[in-house]
């Protein structure tokens, strides 16, 4: 009986990850915005919803295309914040959010060389791009890095989902 339960949980987890992967890739294809795509995939998969959050994430790929914090990190941390965070000012309960969020950042940086867009881009193609510059943005698209970002969005969402599904991070 325990074996069947473990298999059902594993299958459910695998199904969740597969659906999440498909959503993350599709949303990035539609929007071209890694922050919105990662948040939207996680939000839809875990019922976190809120179109205002998606709207607020508009300028966050690389922090306004400056090569700074990767939009996938921001979108994923926003989703984790909705799961683990507090909505009242003045409470110190928000500190509980740091543990799962730091775990996400460690895992993401471990796989992609850092949490900055420039770190990820350099790891994918050996150099960085100024995506606010139209010529460099075109070069970025032509090198195929944009397509590789789809893999990063999907993996970033999986890292966040693994944390959300992990018992040791269950919200109180």
What are the roles of these predicted feature ranges?
Residues 9-14, 41-58, 127-134:
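Acidic-glycine-rich active-site phosphate/pyrophosphate-binding loop
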Residues 99-172:
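C-terminal binding/interaction regions
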Residues 22-29, 59-68, 140-147:
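A short glycine/serine-rich beta->alpha loop
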């Amino acid at each position: 009986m325990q074996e069947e339960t473990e298999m059902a949980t594993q299958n459910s987890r695998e199904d969740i990850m597969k659906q999440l992967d498909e959503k993350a890739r599709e949303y990035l294809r539609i929007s071209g915005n890694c922050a919105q795509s990662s948040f939207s995939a996680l939000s839809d998969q875990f019922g976190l919803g809120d179109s205002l959050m998606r709207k607020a994430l508009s300028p966050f790929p690389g922090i306004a295309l400056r090569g700074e914090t990767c939009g996938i990190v921001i979108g994923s941390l926003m989703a984790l914040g909705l799961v683990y965070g507090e909505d009242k000012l003045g409470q110190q309960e928000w500190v509980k959010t740091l543990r799962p969020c730091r775990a996400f950042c460690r895992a993401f940086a471990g796989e992609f060389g850092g949490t900055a867009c420039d770190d990820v881009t350099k790891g994918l193609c050996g150099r960085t791009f100024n995506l606010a510059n139209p010529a460099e943005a075109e070069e970025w698209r032509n090198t195929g890095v944009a397509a590789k970002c789809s893999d990063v969005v999907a993996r970033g969402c999986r890292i966040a989902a693994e944390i959300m599904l992990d018992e040791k991070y269950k919200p109180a």
